[in-house]
Amino acid sequence: MKITAKDIARWAELREAQGSLPRLVRRLAMQSGTITQLAFPAGESVSLPGWDGEILSSDGDAWVPKGKSCWELSVEANPTTKANRDYDKRTNKTPETVRRSTTLVIVTARRWSKKNAWRDEKLALCEWHSIRAYDADDLEAWLETVQKLNFLKTNTYRRY
């Protein structure tokens, strides 16, 4: 069964997506094979303070940056507004010395037509080592690269 960006965006409208998106991204990230540390609360733990996810990867790949990356995830309807809010909050709360060696990754389960322009605008500020922005289309592509993920067979990620 192919899960499309349209399916993911529809799923983002459901309350369950808020707690399940981190689980999806965590499981996808774990497939990279280069992760040495991973903290990605999911389910009821999404309400805990702190980053939505933190990863340390020895080599990185197309989806998981090499080195330290800090992740913010969202199912909110306006990805740009949420990304700006997360960017400002995390830039203000994270010491510059940490930001200089950390990639900020913003993920939305919505389609986000302005994600590349947003990313380029934020990269130009030179406040983080690097910045990545992923949307439902990227999640679809990432899912396609993964051979076997048993959780895709569960009802949690059924087509909508």
Regions found by a protein language model. Name each.
Residues 1-160:
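Mixed-charge (Asp/Glu-Lys/Arg
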